C-alpha cells in the first residue's frame, strides 16, 4: 500500500510540475498573443477575431487539455516510472500511436469544435482540384471549406487527417480572394509537403 501511495504521489507531483510550467508559459505568451491579434493584425487589416471568440478558443483548449492531455501526461509518467531501462522505447511507442490516432481523429472530432467545415460547392473548381490530385497521386476523402474568416483575413489551404479521414481544407477567405489558377498553385505547394512526406517525417 505504501508503494502504491508513493507511486501515486510521484505521478501527481510530476503532473503538477509539468502543468505548472505549461500554465506559466501560457500566461507569459498571453500578452504577446493579444498584441499580435488585436494590435498588429488589426492594424494591417488581418484580424477578424472578437474578444468573445478569443476567450471561447481558450476555454475549449483548456477543456481539451484536461480531457486528453492530462491522461496522456499521467500515463507517460507511469511509463517512465514503471517500465525500467527501456521506458524511453515504450514511451516512444505510446506517443507514436497517440500521434497517429490524433491524425485520424483531429479533422473529424476536434477541428469542428473550433470551425465550421462544409463540402466545396464550386463544381468547376472541384473538378480542377480533383484532376490535380489525380496527377499527384493524392487520395482524399473530401474537399472542404473552413470559415477561417471567423478569426483572420489570411487565406490558406491545407491537408489533414490520416487514412480515411484524410481531407483537403480551404479557408473561405482564400476562395474569396483568388481565382482557380491561383488556388491550384496554393494547393500545389501543400501537395509538395505530401510528395516529400513531411508529415510522416515530422
Positions of predicted regions on the chain:
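Polar-ligand-bearing catalytic/cofactor-coordination segments
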Residues: 1-202
